[in-house]
Amino acid sequence: MGVSWVFEAEQTAKSVERILEGIGAELMGQFQVDVIPYNPATPSTDYATNIVMHHSKCPQSTFSICPKTDFRVSPKAVCDRGFDLILGKLAGGLVIDNAGKIEINGNEYNIHSDWTVRVGTATQGTTVKGVVVEVEYDPTVIIVQCREMMAEFIKQVFNKYHETQPEIFKITEKPERYSTLDTMWQYLQIAAKLRKKT
């Protein structure tokens, strides 16, 4: 996995896919991301909601994030899929919020072997909430090496969205390693906005 930039698109998924096919993107398959809130069984200010996430690119992993004000201070973990089974046994403390679950399903494209673009429709239950695009630059895992190039790619391909860089791009000044948790944080932030849409 390289460095990813995730954003909500204003167009339909088909419109975004046509743009990608117009620049020579090849359809590689499907992808799925889910964002599942687990709330404290008793409402309390002492305990935060735990967000459990999965990405089809990492089929053996479960991502767990307790969102705070920003990514750096939020408790987070990468676990194996067995973590989901453990959560089921913690029903006395954490209760799954099925109504708040966001699923993103769509297609994965490859462009000139260096870029992977995932275009998915976000749903909450049976309600369509929006279109989410993930642009991944595969050759590097160092943000400072590629963020300007990624902004230029997004500007050239979509003619917008390039000015709203992900939080991790803005706070990273040193050559730090990008991880899948950084991608999942971006999905979490978008899912939080999508839940508020009517």
UniProtKB/Swiss-Prot annotation:
GO MF: transcription coactivator activity
Localization per record: Nucleus
InterPro entries hit by this protein: Mediator_Med20
One GO CC term on file: mediator complex
Main location, first listed in the record: nucleus
Listed transmembrane segments: none
GO biological process terms, semicolon-separated: regulation of transcription by RNA polymerase II
Keyword set, alphabetical order: Activator, Nucleus, Transcription, Transcription regulation
PANTHER family: MEDIATOR OF RNA POLYMERASE II TRANSCRIPTION SUBUNIT 20, UBIQUITIN SPECIFIC PROTEASE HOMOLOG 49
Family according to the record: Belongs to the Mediator complex subunit 20 family.
Function per UniProt: Component of the Mediator complex, a coactivator involved in the regulated transcription of nearly all RNA polymerase II-dependent genes. Mediator functions as a bridge to convey information from gene-specific regulatory proteins to the basal RNA polymerase II transcription machinery. Mediator is recruited to promoters by direct interactions with regulatory proteins and serves as a scaffold for the assembly of a functional preinitiation complex with RNA polymerase II and the general transcription factors.
Subunit-level organization: Component of the Mediator complex.
Name of protein: Mediator of RNA polymerase II transcription subunit 20
Species for this entry: Caenorhabditis briggsae
Gene designation per UniProt: mdt-20
